[in-house]
């Protein structure tokens, strides 16, 4: 990541909105923003393979559900945050991931400029591709600051998105069971 370019761009934005980049409260802002972007965009170019490839053998194929995984990310359209909770269900095929690995999967894909629909897809596809799940179902609930702070200005509005892969695509009863276990 080119932090010098980020700092220069932030200085230009500060000046473009009519502020003084040398004002005491703004002098270190370009460097702070560059460091922040390094952190919140640390998922760029990464996948969840390293997390989901560390799995454990299991003899049954009962559904695994992990819900209320908090995340935050940046909307790629306005570069404003959106945040919320991800709920994951999957059907193992002989292997299960450690529970923290599901949260890490959400984290990897949320640490970049993102849209909610793609975040759903990337998490579900990672479970299928890297864990070898028989099915994956991901529900994400999020509030978007681009809708709360600007535009229609409707704070508190939740957007829900879902994606189903494998067994969840064809089995409505399985999806319904996942919804119930997720409390949705």
Swiss-Prot record:
Biological processes, Gene Ontology terms: one-carbon metabolic process; tetrahydrobiopterin biosynthetic process; tetrahydrofolate biosynthetic process
Keyword field: GTP-binding, Hydrolase, Metal-binding, Nucleotide-binding, One-carbon metabolism, Zinc
Pathway assigned to this chain's UniProt record: Cofactor biosynthesis; 7,8-dihydroneopterin triphosphate biosynthesis; 7,8-dihydroneopterin triphosphate from GTP: step 1/1
Pfam family, one: GTP_cyclohydroI
Protein's UniProt keywords contain Thylakoid: no
Record family assignment: Belongs to the GTP cyclohydrolase I family.
Protein name stated in the entry: GTP cyclohydrolase 1
Protein's organism: Streptococcus pneumoniae (strain Taiwan19F-14)
